[in-house]
Amino acid sequence: MDLLCWMAFGARVLAETAAVLGQAPEASKYTSIAAHLSDAQNLDRLHYDEDSGQYRDWGRHTEDVGLEWRVVQEEGQPSSRQELLRVRERGGREPVLQHVPHFGYVSLFPLMMRLVDPGSEALGEQLRQLQNPDHLWTDYGLRSLSRSSSLYNADNTEHDRPYWRSAIWINMNYLVLAALHHYGLAPGPHREAAARLHDRL
């Protein structure tokens, strides 16, 4: 989902750049691409989970995985070395196509890239969940992953700390802040809530 949002944003930037440079055919082409990628109905159809009120990635997912040490085999024999592997637990559920149930920065990309319709209930829900301290809100900015996520503060691998699984990133907070400013000026039922949230963040 984040890639779709970045591509929509990138196409808008290219369209604006081409227009400034007086390259009308390119501006028209990228405007068309941006409109296609920014289609709010398509975004909602693909990524909005009505039950949670969140935008979510879609893919093959299971919660039944973990990191496990295994002895490395060398020339068919166990060695003294071990490696950490991501494994599915025995008897655990196979990955299935579904919305990935982890609320974090990825969930905010439609908001950050200003793809959510200012009049939509989805925007109101994003604003409500954004300020929930059990999810992302802290006194120091928005954390990268909800505290309720099973992956919160969990290592990716032995040497890969959970940078995107709890930490507060100023660049992402800036994108959210800029989006809140945008929605705080846009006509719609959530204008005042977005402006208040902008001031708090």
Which residues are covered by each model-predicted region?
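Aromatic- and histidine-enriched alpha-helix N-cap/loop-to-helix transition segments
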Residues: 1-9, 101-105, 164-178
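C-terminal substrate/ligand-recognition segments
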Residues: 110-186
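Short helix-adjacent coil turns
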Residues: 21-25, 184-185, 189
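Catalytic cores of carbohydrate-active enzymes
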Residues: 8-118, 198-201
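Short intrinsically disordered, low-complexity coil segments enriched in acidic
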Residues: 1-7, 126-130, 200
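Substrate-binding cleft of carbohydrate-active enzyme catalytic domains
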Residues: 2, 111, 190
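C-terminal structured "cap/appendage" subdomains that terminate the fold
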Residues: 187-201
